[in-house]
């Protein structure tokens, strides 16, 4: 039986998307250097966790799946490090918004995509 090492991370996020992505990449590199083969970064890490905030400006954070800059960047990192990255992102598909998860394989290929319609979920947090 093959042994697989999985890492799950948690980090404080800000409204600075670039800083959050860089911090996530640093965590991925650290986990990889310690032997993790599958590395999970927290849900919707590009910004503060906004689904519990009733602010229309948050819809500006959504990006389409095709040619998604975050997925492309993380795909390159997965390939470089040879790790699997389940990657959460806020997706816009026409006028529908999803809390999506792309599975990026160790060769950088996106294997699967799972979607949850973000506005149908109850608010389960408070600020």
Question: Predicted segments — roles?
Answer:
Residues 116-121:
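Conserved small/polar residues in nucleotide/adenosyl-binding loops
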Residues 17, 29-107:
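Cys-nucleophile CN-hydrolase/nitrilase-fold catalytic domain and related Cys-dependent amidase chemistry
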Residues 107, 113-114:
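Short hydrophobic alpha-helix segments
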Residues 10, 35, 122:
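Conserved functional loop/turn residues at catalytic and ligand-binding sites
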Residues 20-28:
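Short, acidic/polar
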Residues 3-15, 100, 113:
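Active-site-proximal beta-strand elements of phosphoester/diester hydrolases
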